[in-house]
Amino acid sequence: MNLYDVIKKPVITEGSMAQYEAGKYVFEVDTRAHKLLIKQAVEAAFEGVKVANVNTINVKPKAKRVGRYTGFTNKTKKAIVTLTADSKAIELFGAEEE
């Protein structure tokens, strides 16, 4: 698996923004990715970033209904990435203007 295919997108929610201020970043990742691969992908995608810890969560599919038809959403995997104290911060929203 290519390192640049591991991270799909950042998760932007109220809970993830609370963790963002504590130095933890939440990403949606490929369901086949393991913790070491996620760590390597984050360090390759963001220059100057050192990962201290990776926690993963498997999100189960939810039942959804459209009229009388029932289906399920896709299963996903989330990764909570903690950076070391001497690491650069990840800019999720681009550079700040002065």
From Swiss-Prot:
GO terms for molecular function: rRNA binding; structural constituent of ribosome. InterPro entries: Nucleotide-bd_a/b_plait_sf, Ribosomal_uL23-like, Ribosomal_uL23/eL15/eS24_sf, Ribosomal_uL23_CS. SUPFAM superfamilies: Ribosomal proteins S24e, L23 and L15e. The keyword Cell wall biogenesis/degradation does not apply. GO terms for biological process: translation. Keywords: Ribonucleoprotein, Ribosomal protein, RNA-binding, rRNA-binding. The keyword ATP-binding does not apply. Signal peptide: none annotated. It holds the Pfam family Ribosomal_L23. It comes from the Bacteria. Gene3D superfamilies: 3.30.70.330. GO terms for cellular component: ribonucleoprotein complex; ribosome. PANTHER family: 60S RIBOSOMAL PROTEIN L23A. One of the early assembly proteins it binds 23S rRNA. One of the proteins that surrounds the polypeptide exit tunnel on the outside of the ribosome. Forms the main docking site for trigger factor binding to the ribosome. HAMAP family: Ribosomal_uL23_B. Belongs to the universal ribosomal protein uL23 family. Part of the 50S ribosomal subunit. Contacts protein L29, and trigger factor when it is bound to the ribosome. This is Large ribosomal subunit protein uL23.
